[in-house]
Amino acid sequence: MGVDHSAGVDLEALACPAGARELGSQLMGLRPGTHEFGRDSGTLQVCTFREGLAQKIGHDLIIDVERWEAEVEVGHDGTPSAVRLEADARSLNVREGLHGGKPLSDKDRADISKTIDEKILGGQPIAFRSSALERHDGRLTVRGDLTIAGTTRPASFEMDLREDGGVSGTLPVTQSEWGIKPYRGFMGALKVRDTVEVVLDAALPSD
């Protein structure tokens, strides 16, 4: 997500560690019905990636979404038929700043979160609604509409339902397609990659 450098926020780069989420290869069946879950049973994070000649002086960030809820509707055959997710754009908090010349302070993290809220997302709701789910090669491709910062566009991601009852998926988001300008600093030598990842990892409620 882009940040206005004039705001005085030390947000040179955002990133998620490589391999932070490894999706399984087997798609399991689920109990028919509507499964609701949220922060109490999982995590929703935004992972961003730095680039540019000066990327070594920047930080990679992992941003937690603190308030969110999701639903998965499952048909009689045990296969999901719909996915919905809503998140509070004012609840994004920086969990960790990786790499960089010096660690992020608590103030740095708070300033970054404030800038994301006020200058980027504007407190507008974040929502995803599926329109089609396709099962193939032991995985589920979820297609639908994603709303960020007042703009709604098509989006898709791979979802994995694990044998332990967990659900995981990574949704790539190209910021500029939602009207968000990725951060650039040091005359363009340090940039936030346009495509970020929204990573879900949660446990579905048991019977």
Per-segment meaning from a language model:
Residues 1-3, 7-9:
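Hydrophobic alpha-helical signal/anchor motif
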Residues 14-207:
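Low-complexity, acidic/polar, glycine-enriched regions of mature
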